């Protein structure tokens, strides 16, 4: 009986000691496992962090690329708008230059038209006056012929003839002044060189005391209309004695 009781006590003590040894040993055995679990979790978290970072970078890269594309497109749009504005400005400058050119030509044409119209009116006026003046010149010529027909002795001895002569001379002067107001002037070429554009030679006589080619006698007075020859003077010209 005692032996059986001792053996049972020993067994129970052994079992307890084994349990205690297991309790003591278990933490030592589990420590490496926990460290491995922690390492694995750390690696997993690192891997997940890298993956998240990569995903974030991957998500950011398309956004950055999209923003870059938008900026590039915006820059292209701005450049195209600037080019379009430059083209419009150049076109407007050309149109403005053309308008200025047309305006200058229009002004020049208008001034030329004014000048030509003025000249045409003056020509028409001169032509009408020329025809009328030529008819009046015959009357003036008759006054000259009448006055030249009276001799000086008659004027000295006959007062009535003298009064008539003075009246005819005054009438002639009135005619000449009236013609002068309209640009018609008498030409007296005595002593001038013969000019075929203004004079008409009716005869030539050699005179030793006068220079050849000069006008020494006026048979009919000449007249000009606004400095143009209305009627050439009929004159006698000194002839060269050697010819």
From Swiss-Prot:
Localization (cell): Mitochondrion matrix
Gene Ontology molecular function, alphabetical:
adenyl-nucleotide exchange factor activity; protein homodimerization activity; protein-folding chaperone binding; unfolded protein binding
InterPro entries from the UniProt entry: GrpE, GrpE_coiled_coil, GrpE_head
Give any Gene Ontology cellular component.
Answer: PAM complex, Tim23 associated import motor
Disordered: annotated span: 42-75
Q: Specify whether Transit peptide is a keyword of the entry.
A: yes
Where does this protein chiefly localize? Answer: mitochondrion
Listed A to Z, the keywords are: Chaperone, Mitochondrion, Transit peptide
Q: Which Pfam families match?
A: GrpE
Listed SUPFAM superfamilies: Coiled-coil domain of nucleotide exchange factor GrpE (SSF58014), Head domain of nucleotide exchange factor GrpE (SSF51064)
The keyword Chaperone is annotated on this UniProt entry: yes
Q: Where is the composition biased (Basic and acidic residues)?
A: 44-55
| Gene Ontology annotations of biological process type | protein import into mitochondrial matrix; protein refolding
Quaternary structure note: Component of the PAM complex, at least composed of mtHsp70, MGE1, TIM44, PAM16, PAM17 and PAM18.
Tell me which family the UniProt entry assigns to this protein: Belongs to the GrpE family.
Instruction: Please give the function described in this protein's UniProt entry.
Output: Essential component of the PAM complex, a complex required for the translocation of transit peptide-containing proteins from the inner membrane into the mitochondrial matrix in an ATP-dependent manner. Seems to control the nucleotide-dependent binding of SSC1 to substrate proteins.
Q: What is this protein called?
A: GrpE protein homolog, mitochondrial
* Organism per entry: Debaryomyces hansenii (strain ATCC 36239 / CBS 767 / BCRC 21394 / JCM 1990 / NBRC 0083 / IGC 2968) (Yeast)
Tell me the gene name.
Answer: mge1
